[in-house]
Amino acid sequence: MNDSPKKVLIYTDGACSGNPGSGGYGTVLIYNNHRKELSGGFRLTTNNRMEMMAAIVGLETLTIKCAVTLYTDSRYLVDAITKGWAKKWKANGWKRNAKENAKNPDLWEKLLDLCSQHEVDFVWVKGHAGHQENEYCDRLAVRASQQTNLPSDEVYENKGIET
């Protein structure tokens, strides 16, 4: 019996019309011959929040522990996870340093929790450089950001957090 986790590829991208502005995320999950596409958006948000939401939504879709390779063109996302910044910010009460709060603590909290449930390898890809799945996720994200009646990114809009 093979107890090794299922290997899943997750491709992500975020988009924002203005920063802040209306934003969207696009996510593609691939497992064997199965493909799932997810997208959504918010009426007022930031590009970094949409990059993070794309990863969060992809990981939230998984129902069992998986070995995930997550592709993103967001250095912010990759560096904060792979260089341990997000864990450090959390340990410091969501402070980057003595004078500066970490941005997007609500989403980092979710992402760190999801990463603890899976084996996640974050891989940076250059955006708009012909990477097929990244380009597709970009189209999903842009399309989502252009929808009418987008919901509120309540934490961003109502709590006035820095992003």
UniProtKB/Swiss-Prot annotation:
It catalyses: Endonucleolytic cleavage to 5'-phosphomonoester. It is an enzyme of class 3 (hydrolase). Residues 4-146 form the RNase H type-1 domain. Its EC number is 3.1.26.4. Mg(2+) 1 binds at residues 13, 51, 73. The keyword Transmembrane helix does not apply. InterPro entries: RNase_H (IPR050092), RNaseH-like_sf (IPR012337), RNaseH_domain (IPR002156), RNaseH_sf (IPR036397), RNaseHI (IPR022892). Belongs to the RNase H family. Monomer. This is Ribonuclease H. It comes from Rippkaea orientalis (strain PCC 8801 / RF-1) (Cyanothece sp. (strain PCC 8801)). The gene is rnhA.
